[in-house]
Amino acid sequence: MHIYILGSAAGGGFPQWNCNCPNCHGVRTGTINAKVRTQSSIAISENGVDWILLNASPDIRQQLFDFKAAQPARKLRDTGITNVILMDSQLDHTTGLLTLREGCPINVWCTEMVYQDLTTGFPVFNMLKHWNGGLQYHQIDPKQAFKIDGFENLEFLPLIIQSAAPPYSPHRHDPHEGDNIALIIKDHKTQKQLFYAPGLGKIDDQIMQIMQDSDCVMIDGTLWTDDEMQQTGVGKKTGREMGHLYISGEGGSLSYLNQLSTPKKVLIHINNTNPILNEDSAQFAELKANDVEVAFDGMQIEL
């Protein structure tokens, strides 16, 4: 399985266009050791030619330009992207579908709850239905594994996770199964497994076992502390209120990752306020000392 990190930041990217927090100001001025990052999305493939997008970021045009394998140039209009899987209906994971409209029809895999959001609160399926067949909806049963034509060796097992529907969702404060999923992606040729959960509000015993059984875990790294948005003065909500488990301290994701002995451990969906973006920070050093990597745009993993 080929895994390519198209974007590794949370919504707004890094630096966020209107933010002058220490991280954003520092990366703009070159006064901190940090990489510019686009909004989170990854691509996976079993042959290096045909690719599946996991989430469609608002930055998708630039991401695909930087990702040369996405353009095999076999004909006048071409792309290596054949399918899109949506983990949720968050704007930073779905607005890229609008940019992909020239490639319609496009196969889009998502749960019924995500499809409801994308035909009501943010009706992108409706908007694109006249674009050469539009978005072709394939329903994900959040309790059942599925396969995608052309990717015979890959199996996708959804996992219902605790997080939150987006603010625009008609059921923002009425959670349903399928609002957010994680994915266990198994490559039956190499017998390797990826656990992908860019939006993760809680780690329970089931998720711990799945992570231990995986060869690579790529999980939510939005915030270092639960009150980070408040402490930096950029917001009023905690991480948990937004559906994101913080990294540090008791009950943070790092305390769980440190219990894993086998898999490669990667944090993705990093908010612009998170001190781990500064590679000279104590927080980045702490992750490195615990063999936890911070995803960056262009990062590649082979399983």
Swiss-Prot record:
Signal peptide: none annotated. This is Coenzyme PQQ synthesis protein B. The lineage of its organism: Bacteria, Pseudomonadati, Pseudomonadota, Gammaproteobacteria, Moraxellales. One of its GO terms (biological process) is pyrroloquinoline quinone biosynthetic process. SUPFAM superfamilies: Metallo-hydrolase/oxidoreductase. Pfam families: Lactamase_B_2 (PF12706). Transmembrane segments: none annotated. The gene is pqqB. Belongs to the PqqB family. It comes from Acinetobacter baumannii (strain AYE).
